Amino acid sequence: MGRTLTDRARGYLTTFEDMTGAAVADCIVLDDRVVIVVDPGEMGAAIGPDGTHVQAVESAIDSTVKVVEGADDPARFVANALAPAAVEHVVVSTQGEVTVAYVEVAAADRGVAIGRDGRTIGLARTLAARHHDIDDVQLA
């Protein structure tokens, strides 16, 4: 799956970069939030001291913002997408045409990794497909 940005997502991406100084790799606009994927190593700039950068962007765009740190390594990327769940291990396996990321999380964080109505793991699946051609993310 490739990355196609809507005009609205492009606008939010530009606003986020301008307000935080962080390099943004992707932006997805959902019904209840905006998801920003920043380049590796850009989380500090994106969040800002005590979350001030994210809070300023949320006020400017009048929406909740979730920031995910990008990664060149598919396993690291999937773990980042499931944050704040404590991911213990990720194995990315390809069988035939299908690539699946199997994720082990701390037992206490299984609900966090799934999220309300499956939102967190659903977002991880979407991002993994957009950035690393991973077809599915499953909790092991």
Range-by-range predicted roles:
Residues M1-A140:
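Acidic, polar-rich N-terminal leader regions of halophilic archaeal proteins
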